[in-house]
Amino acid sequence: MPHIALQTDVPGIRGLAMFRPETAKPLYDLAQVLQRGESPLSEAERELIAAYVSHLNDCMFCMNSHAAAAKCLYGSDKNIVDDALHDMQQSAVSDKLKALLHIAGRVQVLGSAVTQQDIDAAKNLGATDKEIHDTVLIAATFCMFNRYVDGMATMTPTEQNEYAAMGERMAKGYVPPTP
């Protein structure tokens, strides 16, 4: 049950967006730029980073919804998402993406936990400064989103088919709901 009077039938951040549309717009704009804007990282990779950080934060709504978006974007390679969330090191994601996910995991713990060694390892595997930048910003942003969603105890669906529908919508872009 949400900690404040939210529409109980609107899950996660969408319920919060409907409660405060004036704060929703800049948050959705940021998500749109990070997840769908220009980046050397694919949209699928960016959604996987969001899902991975949300998984580490134990934010079930964000993890499931962004994993669903990543699956839509990965298409026939969608199993890579569950594999990476289950055991990133043994998954079929590229070594470069594993290094970037490692950095995202460091950000999730504490921003200053990212070391020059982490950055050098990613660069040695081909990561660019922009890919590293985007990874850190996505990880930091989703830590905030996770804390916002869970800190307000928003409604979290338990049925995976609800997340599949969310993932399809999110794969097309981030548009705030209207009250």
Go through the PLM ranges and name each one.
Residues 1-179:
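Hydrophobic alpha-helical segments
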